[in-house]
């Protein structure tokens, strides 16, 4: 009974991993895969980070993005001047 917590931990890990991947809908899973691939590209090209951040944070091209900016057009980030 001394090492009883090891198998329970492994089972919990496997269950959490399986639920974490299957809890997301199939459509979102495909988007997440694309986002992950593009995120790697974003990390590589940090020069145009603002536009990529706007695209990823907006999601639907319109709305709040870039922390305080607004997504305009396809993925153009405009930060309102206060």
Swiss-Prot record:
GO molecular function: ion channel regulator activity; toxin activity
Propeptide residue interval(s): 24-48
Chief localization: secreted
Subcellular location(s) of the protein: Secreted
Tissues expressing this chain: Expressed by the venom duct.
UniProt entry keywords in alphabetical sequence: Disulfide bond, Ion channel impairing toxin, Knottin, Neurotoxin, Secreted, Signal, Toxin
Annotated signal peptide: 1-23
Disulfide-bonded cysteines: 54-66, 58-71, 65-77
Cellular component annotations (GO), alphabetically ordered: extracellular region
Described purpose of this protein according to its UniProt entry: Acts as a neurotoxin by inhibiting an ion channel.
Domain writeup: The cysteine framework is VI/VII (C-C-CC-C-C).
Name of protein: Turripeptide Lol6.1
Record lineage: Eukaryota, Metazoa, Spiralia, Lophotrochozoa, Mollusca
